Amino acid sequence: VLKNVSFGVRSGMIFGIAGVQGNGQVELIDLMTRKRAVREGDIRLNGTSIKKLSIQDIRKMQFGYVPEDRIEQGIAGQESIAENMVSNRYATSEFCRGGLLDYKKIEEFADENIQEYEIRCSGNKQKVGMLSGGNMQKVVVARECSHDPQVLIAEQPTRGVDVGAAHIIHKKIMELRNEGCAVLLVSADLSEALKLSDVIAVMYEGEIVAYFDNTEGLNEEKLGLYMLGLERHSEEQIRRARG
């Protein structure tokens, strides 16, 4: 259960939510991605309430989402890399003309991303389910980041991937931030949260117990104390940090 969770993510910012798994992060993202209904409070994107919109409507607002479970929620394993790359944009004019898919454009787009993200595969027609976990994740990240999102939610984006894949994913997230995207990063990886985040909020037992508007001087040991519930900020400290 979430308890009075309130924060804002600005354009050109990576807002990190750190916490041991099972402390409300999944519930929070489920609300933001419309997997759960919002019964109290509100969620706004560029000032517009999205709590009654479908995920399809939200995606039209240049919204990207890298889910925690890439196999169950991020890919269609029996479909090709090319098909997975455009699964969130099949009906757009970029890849569809007169009601027909432009397979040449789709494959060119997939090939560009395969090269940019260094996806190890036999070609764009290979089934995504045949890839390694790290390469599956790069397909998901490429799809969600390649349409210039205004907002990106990245949920445990490098879990279970090798160092090389993690480096590529981190680089892309930071590039999006530098281009003005508002990034919400949810991570249980202390080093990842500290490396990428401009601001960090710590969740424990469904509430924000610490809010760092400046991560300079913050280290893994200190952050870990808040994640374990051993320390917490006062309500006044959180209010001041949020501005």
Question: How would you label these PLM feature ranges?
Answer:
Residues V1-G243:
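Glycine-rich phosphate-binding loops of nucleotide-dependent enzymes
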